[in-house]
Amino acid sequence: MNRPERLQPGVKLRDADKVSRIPVKIVPSERETMLRKPDWLRVKLPASNQRILEIKQALRSNGLHSVCEEASCPNLAECFNHGTATFMILGAICTRRCPFCDVAHGRPLKPDADEPVKLAQTIRDMKLKYVVITSVDRDDLRDGGAQHFADCIREIRKLNPEIKIEILVPDFRGRIDAALDILSTEPPDVFNHNLETAPMHYRKARPGANYQWSLDLLKRFKERHPNVPTKSGLMMGLGETNEEIAQVLRDLREHKVEMLTLGQYLQPSKFHLPVERYVSPAEFDELKVLADELGFTHAACGPLVRSSYHADLQAQGKEVK
């Protein structure tokens, strides 16, 4: 039996190379079998792309990454044109192979020790008032990257004392207590960790993750920081039912999560998990009603909603869909 070829540091694996060794194999989609995208998912491009180019240049010149680009987010043009971006720290190579996600897999490079300062300077130069900081999974690091998150929060606040910071963290697999100890030194204004889908779909969609671990991470952070809102996001269209999603919402509330994002899964390439259904705006509205009834303080539910989509407005309690 041939051993898998050893990954070279810094080499990005995408598409078929990325998903070749996941537990549930994916048959590449054929155009004829792919569901037709409904009109409500067609994104209008802004009239001017000048602001988009400016933000991309600011990221490039400082060696920074945005999840907007790395994950091929459909809202990139809208968010960049409004001067907002979700920064992705700890590099652009993930140690996981989630087949719904377009971020590259591989063996990451050592974290950039200068990234926290560069990030803080870029945010100051962009005059941002609210930022979302996320990262790839870093199972290669003993703390899962928690110290780097704390360093970034500290440096951002040094240069931007009035800013609000939301962090969208990985699951810190096997390191929850150590990670939360570190994050307690520099707690964010919003703590976000995405469950992504219902538990019965984890094996195919989130290999290496565990539904209960993720719920425990959210609850244990909340126990340490009762005044910091906790938040989670889900995708629809991976084979789940509306009732399965409703149960996830109940689980989130039982674990003291207050903010919710719920959006439509879109297939990044033919090598990723196929879209099994397009959920109508009316169904998202029904789930929004349920979320409100369950006691979520903020619930953004709609086809194009993503976990950091208009995160500043979500945090202010304004309706986003």
Swiss-Prot record:
The main location class comes to cytoplasm
Q: Which gene encodes it?
A: lipA
Q: What is this protein called?
A: Lipoyl synthase
Claim: Disulfide bond is one of the keywords in the record: no
Binding sites annotated in the UniProt record for [4Fe-4S] cluster 1 = 68, 73, 79, 308
Q: How is the cofactor bound?
A: Binds 2 [4Fe-4S] clusters per subunit. One cluster is coordinated with 3 cysteines and an exchangeable S-adenosyl-L-methionine.
For this protein, the Enzyme Commission number is 2.8.1.8
Q: Which residues bind [4Fe-4S] cluster 2?
A: 94, 98, 101
Q: Which UniProt keywords apply?
A: 4Fe-4S, Cytoplasm, Iron, Iron-sulfur, Metal-binding, S-adenosyl-L-methionine, Transferase
- HAMAP family listed in its UniProt record: Lipoyl_synth (MF_00206)
List the source organism. Shewanella sp. (strain MR-7)
Its subcellular locations are:
Cytoplasm
